[in-house]
């Protein structure tokens, strides 16, 4: 895996080993950022971060900050290794449950311009109710939430859908904050 564009274009990144981790491939990541558009100065939240590929891509493309969240120890350590390798600043890594992080950020009044959600596909149905109740409270006005899922699934959140596209076995759905 590599960074697609920006200040760290072409840099290879580490991926955590394990059955639960399915890093977003280069092709899908490039498509995601083509759909999103410029992220200069954005505050980004990368939920279920895994390798951190999505948030790292955002930082490389000019995001002001990124918060990486993954409950898995190896995944969180991998994100830290990638940040160190790439020399990217403006990042925090939390090894905790995504729902807990959303609740903490909402209580603290923290808002994000871009939220990237890429849970293990088989777990998405379990996480959707939590996302539906907690995600809107951390979205800044006119921000975006990107949810990756299996191509056959269509995630539903209480937010307007900007677009939903299939890329092989992956569906990418962009939700807009009101």
Which role does the model predict for each range below?
Residues 1-178:
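Class I S-adenosyl-L-methionine-dependent methyltransferase catalytic core
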């Amino acid at each position: 895996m590599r960074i697609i564009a920006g200040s760290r274009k072409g840099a290879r990144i580490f991926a955590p080993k394990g059955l639960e981790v399915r890093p977003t491939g280069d092709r899908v990541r490039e498509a995601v950022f083509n759909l999103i558009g410029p992220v200069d100065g954005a505050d980004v939240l990368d939920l279920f971060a895994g390798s951190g590929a999505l948030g790292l891509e955002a930082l490389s493309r000019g995001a002001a900050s990124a918060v990486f969240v993954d409950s898995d120890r190896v995944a969180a350590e991998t994100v830290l290794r990638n940040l160190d390798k790439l020399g990217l600043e403006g990042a925090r890594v939390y090894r905790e449950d995504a729902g807990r992080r959303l609740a903490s950020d909402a209580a603290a009044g923290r808002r994000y311009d871009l939220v990237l959600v890429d849970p293990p596909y088989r777990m998405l149905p379990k996480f959707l109710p939590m996302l539906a109740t907690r995600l809107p409270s951390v979205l800044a006005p006119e921000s975006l939430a990107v949810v990756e899922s299996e191509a056959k699934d269509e995630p539903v959140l209480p937010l307007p859908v900007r677009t939903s596209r299939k890329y092989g076995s992956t569906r990418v759905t962009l939700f807009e904050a009101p």
